[in-house]
Amino acid sequence: AVRNVVRGRTGAGRHTLLTSLAARAGRSLGVIDLGTVPREPGKLAHALEAVLRRALLRGLVPCVDGLELISSEDPDTKIQVGAVLRTHPGPIALRLPTDAQIPLDPGYLLLDLPQRNEIQRGESWGKALERHHIALQDPSDLAGRYRVGPGIIERVCAEVARRPDRPADAAAW
């Protein structure tokens, strides 16, 4: 089965990349946020297994998020969750922070999304502002002030586009 792992900072485009990969396979992405799963000892692995099974039956590519949260849990839980991920019969995607440990056996596709520099962030701001029809003279001010990736830039521009009182200059952001 296909195993994709994407690591990077929040807002770096991990979700967008995994959604695109799932779409190329003719499927939708189903996000499983382990931060919302009850933390009762011995139950996390069973809960994850059940959710993965449901995703498989619905034809989704499950995307497990929040695995870094279980690193502080007891070692047994970590081992059990790793076993559930390794034995899942369908495709699976893992969304991890930069430099997180990967709880899969070799054979997965690893995509590390790098941190973007100010010029790249400026390009992302410019494209998102244009796409959402937001007039702003110089997006480089935003790129210098906010060290965020294209995912967050897109969400911010979508939100600003919905507002009736759009900021007219970078200082108002």
Regions found by a protein language model. Give the residues of each.
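ATP/nucleotide-binding catalytic cores
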Residues: A1-W173
